[in-house]
Amino acid sequence: MDNQPKIKTSAALRFIFVTIFIDVMGLAIIIPVIPKLLEQLGDVNISVASEINGWLTATYAIMQILFSPVMGNLSDRFGRRPILLISLIGFCIDYTFMAFAPSVFWLFVGRTIAGITGATMSTATAYIADISTGDKRAANFGIVGAASGLGFIIGVSGGAFLGGIDIKFPFMVAAAAALFNALYGYFVLPESLDKTHRRKFEWKRANPVGSFIQLGKYRALLGLAIAFTLVYIAQKAVEYQLPFYVYEKFQWSMISVGCLGLFIGFMLICIQGWLIRYLIPKWGLQKNIIIGLVSYGVGLLLIAFSSYGWQMYLYMIPYCFGGISGPALQGYITSKFEANEQGELQGGLTLLSSISLVVGPLVMGYSFKFFTHKDSAVYFPGAPYILGALLILISILIVIRSLKKDINPAR
């Protein structure tokens, strides 16, 4: 009888691993082909395609800003399970639009739908918070990184291979994966939020302003929120500009991008799925956050000034090691919130991430276009990575100051 909660927790974590794996795989599978798809549908060069990609991502993020607080609060009211399933169906519709879109316009339609319903990651992290206690919470958040890494490996490599067959084939596979996961969740996923821990749905808390107000109850958290919004923006230099960067600077093929994706995913699995479980007890949450951010910044600077394609593998090592900061931050923040506030918290953090998705890809896309356009006075495709490193530096200064304070409710 004593082992029952452990068995349930283990089974739930396995499902969340699969959910995040398929979700990230669906996102990663399109990475090698999205530059070529935009060039083809929009009849533009890669510099302009990078700009379009920024707007495409921003459209998704704006919908997330408007609707993620609603989805987070709904998960606190009705449970995590139904929200996860709705999100997966939304992604299935989005990828279907991408697979059969006759023009760029329909890509925007699909991204809008996915942005409205997309709460997979925030609900999954709230789910983990529901079933985790004490020191295991931060370690369990490492599952998110491990699943993301494996999904990234399979997604990017599979996308590179499938894109060589047909440029729209990866989107069909992504749609099928999202649908499969929704069906899998419908029959297998248990609810994690007990009815006694649920609360009434409140519109004043289910909007962007309401989420900021709730986050504002925690003085030091505001500083961390600002800092990690800057980190999210900096990460977009790698997440959304990397294919454009290596296509432009090194004239890589889709297969080459896929191979780099394999390496990045392998690193994420090793660091966030295994190494972090030793580093958190050894260094503590705060030290992991700082060391991770410094490593992020170093990696971005090295990538910016890379001269040969093989160096991308070497310089991705410090960048990927920076991933230890994410689970540490999640564990640090979630420990300050009650069980019936976890959905709202994750909705608020997703809101901040979505703000970075509006600003990051647009800023990084414009900087890439500005320094690679044929009329540019200075040719430097690494500009987005320099900008990202500067944002990391600012975030480190803010985090150091914020962590000196205790996060206590300002009530």
Locations of the language-model features?
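Juxtamembrane intracellular "pre-TM" segments in multi-pass secondary transporters
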Residues: 2-10, 190-227, 248-249
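Short amphipathic helix-loop junctions that connect adjacent transmembrane helices
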Residues: 33-50, 240-257
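Conserved MFS/SLC helix-loop-helix module at the cytosolic interface between two early adjacent transmembrane helices
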Residues: 65-104
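Helix-to-loop junctions at the C-terminal end of transmembrane segments
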Residues: 66-79, 271-285, 368
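Helix-breaking motifs and short loop linkers at transmembrane-helix boundaries and internal kinks
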Residues: 79, 100-105, 117, 132, ...
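Cytoplasmic helix-loop-helix junction between adjacent transmembrane helices
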Residues: 109-149
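A membrane-interface helix-boundary motif in multi-pass transporters
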Residues: 163-176, 366-392
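C-terminal transmembrane helical hairpin of 12-TM major facilitator-type secondary transporters
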Residues: 286-329
